[in-house]
Amino acid sequence: MKNRVYESLTTVFSVLVVSSFLYIWFATY
């Protein structure tokens, strides 16, 4: 159960990082 929550949190965190990186890249382009 705890491993499942950690896995989902890691997925959400990576998605946020990628989306913010793409947003900054498009904004500065």
UniProtKB/Swiss-Prot annotation:
It is found in: Cell inner membrane. It comes from the Bacteria. Signal peptide: none annotated. The chain crosses the membrane at residues 5-27. The keyword Nucleotidyltransferase does not apply. Keywords: Cell inner membrane, Cell membrane, Membrane, Transmembrane, Transmembrane helix. The keyword Phosphoprotein does not apply. One of its GO terms (cellular component) is plasma membrane. One of its GO terms (molecular function) is enzyme inhibitor activity. Its main location: membrane. It is a single-pass membrane protein. May bind to BasS and modulate its sensor kinase activity. This is Putative membrane protein PmrR. The gene is pmrR.
